[in-house]
């Protein structure tokens, strides 16, 4: 029984020995490869040899785009491949070892950096191990968080799209020493930024529309000298404007609509109109400051939303001016201003008909007040006679004789009384009339004074009503003008964003889409 259990005790020992043998093979291979190896020398067997370096960029997260600093922050993986003849081995000599993991600081690496960084960080975030195959090819996949410069065009903000790029090049090697190229898979060149759907995190503000990649040669290098190659990865991103529509544009439109509604207040309520309009003006100024903190401080272009807010400010200021002008016109009187015939014709006849406003023609106050009584009968309910109609329609001073004849008749009567009684008149009657003549003349003069005051008051009231009606018509004209300006301006400004679309192809004139066939 004991003899049968010995093989079972030997199995763990055998496994440990085999593992130690495997580790020894990897350690021996690493020692052999690193013997006499200089990581600072370019892996070229001859001076004229060019080392091919393949690049591939995998995007895992588009973190943010800071418009004020014009900086794009991305989380990427940089895949680099090259061949080093000093790292070759025969797998049969090392127990069938096909992959060797080596610290990246122990081998030569191409000094490829992000040229257009904005924070001074040119290198990757983590120097992870490299994978070396028996033929000497090295595979390196370091992660990095880059902050690259991205010129921001704010012309159509927040309905804009931006063209950002990540430019990689060798810091010291020229094209005669290193040949940068895009990686290939299945015989196809990867001319795009690779995105793994399972590892990629969608950005809440930006949507990626195009992600091509291109090889460029430094045009600034002299013709007799070797230039530097650049691998440029482009990101054409479009902003998702829902946040700005809900938090800025919609409140501005609603607040400006309140400024339009002040025209429904009476024409004489100019103080209340100005108060509402100025409050709207202050609210729009706050929104303008919020937008100014978001966009970059540049004078090359004015953001679309800033144009709209400025337009709303102008409309609101015009509304305040209209309210002041209408109030000034409505409070005019015949004592301060005389109405021209053209003004009366345009604002009291033509415009009310065009605007379908019910403006009743003005009539004298006494006659206008008497019409209801003529229609409804006397206060006692009896029918009105012709004499009562005259008494109701005319002033009391006109019942005796007309205004222009009154003074002449009184003067003629006094002259006859002074000459003496005529035939058929008794001296007593003439004497009593002569004694009462001064009182009658005083009564007539009092009636004349009352008639003149009544006429002046009627003229004054009629003039006030005319100016008030002119103010009403002017207020209605300003309302229609401001409403048309507000609607047309809002539609015109935001229709400009409709034509600002991301191009269907990343490069004008190039029919290629720079995307894998599956996309």
UniProtKB/Swiss-Prot annotation:
Gene Ontology biological process terms from the UniProt entry: acetylcholine receptor signaling pathway; chemical synaptic transmission; membrane depolarization; monoatomic ion transmembrane transport
Annotated GO MF terms: acetylcholine receptor activity; acetylcholine-gated monoatomic cation-selective channel activity; transmitter-gated monoatomic ion channel activity involved in regulation of postsynaptic membrane potential
Side of membrane Cytoplasmic, spans: 330-476
Family in the record: Belongs to the ligand-gated ion channel (TC 1.A.9) family. Acetylcholine receptor (TC 1.A.9.1) subfamily. Gamma/CHRNG sub-subfamily.
Catalytic activity entry: K(+)(in) = K(+)(out); Na(+)(in) = Na(+)(out)
Designated gene of the protein: CHRNG
Role according to the record: After binding acetylcholine, the AChR responds by an extensive change in conformation that affects all subunits and leads to opening of an ion-conducting channel across the plasma membrane.
GO CC, alphabetical: acetylcholine-gated channel complex; neuromuscular junction; neuron projection; plasma membrane; postsynaptic membrane; synapse
Extracellular side: 23-240
Residues passing through the membrane, by range: 241-265, 274-292, 308-329, 477-497
Signal peptide: 1-22
Keywords, ordered alphabetically: Cell membrane, Disulfide bond, Glycoprotein, Ion channel, Ion transport, Ligand-gated ion channel, Membrane, Postsynaptic cell membrane, Receptor, Signal, Synapse, Transmembrane, Transmembrane helix, Transport
Glycosylation sites: 52, 163
Predominant location: membrane
Disulphides: 150-164
Species of origin: Bos taurus (Bovine)
Membrane-protein topology: Multi-pass membrane protein
Subcellular location: Postsynaptic cell membrane; Cell membrane
Assembly and interaction partners: Pentamer of two alpha chains, and one each of the beta, delta, and gamma (in immature muscle) or epsilon (in mature muscle) chains.
Protein name, per record: Acetylcholine receptor subunit gamma
KW Nuclease (keyword) present: no
